[in-house]
């Protein structure tokens, strides 16, 4: 039962990622509700995996465990930053909270959202035990190419390093295309996370 709940929570977070990234096309109100849903799923994910946090200072650390610790702590910081900055910028659900500094909140929210996309996808990939027929699976290189194409087309590097503080949205594109692009980027970094974990496992 607990395993099924854990899977449902993880799948829910993966589904919400591309939807949240397409916020301008989805709408501000929907984005805020999706953001709250993501934070609640994040809390549920950590509660379901509370043993991992309890065992941080126990046992030996190999390469994989060190990487997981770094990624998990960064994701925790990112999610807290997204939640606080999101509440500060809210024009709908939390509009009654009037906090100054929305320009800083917007910059933090932008930075955290794109790093969150990368690291949460990477984190998910680290927990994939095995990709069936990976050497003969033609879908892997296809997803990698689609992910790289979307990564470049969406100027992700500019947002990761705040070279651009405003997300350029092409409103002529359909919501589906935008969501698919972010989904492909997410899948790309899941594959990267999976590959890095396998490499570290051979070195351990």
Show which residues each predicted segment covers.
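Membrane-embedded alpha-helical bundles that constitute the cytochrome b-like, heme-associated redox core
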Residues: 1-204
């Amino acid at each position: 039962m607990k395993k099924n709940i854990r899977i449902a929570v993880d799948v829910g977070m993966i589904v919400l990622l591309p939807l949240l990234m397409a916020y301008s096309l989805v709408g501000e109100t929907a984005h805020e509700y999706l953001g709250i849903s993501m934070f609640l799923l994040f809390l549920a994910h950590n509660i379901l995996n509370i043993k991992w946090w309890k065992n941080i200072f126990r046992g030996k650390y190999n390469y994989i465990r060190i990487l997981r610790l770094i990624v998990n702590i960064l994701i925790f910081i990112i999610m807290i930053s997204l939640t606080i900055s999101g509440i500060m910028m809210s024009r709908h659900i939390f509009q009654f909270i009037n906090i100054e500094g929305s320009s800083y909140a917007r910059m933090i929210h932008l930075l955290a959202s794109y790093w969150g996309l990368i690291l949460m996808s990477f984190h998910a990939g680290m927990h994939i035990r095995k990709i069936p027929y990976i050497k003969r699976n033609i879908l892997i290189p296809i997803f990698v190419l689609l992910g790289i194409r979307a990564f470049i087309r969406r100027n992700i590097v500019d947002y990761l390093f705040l070279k651009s503080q405003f997300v350029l949205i092409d409103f002529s594109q359909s919501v589906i295309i935008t969501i698919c692009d972010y989904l492909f980027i997410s899948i790309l970094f899941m594959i990267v996370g999976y590959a890095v974990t396998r490499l570290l496992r051979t070195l351990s």
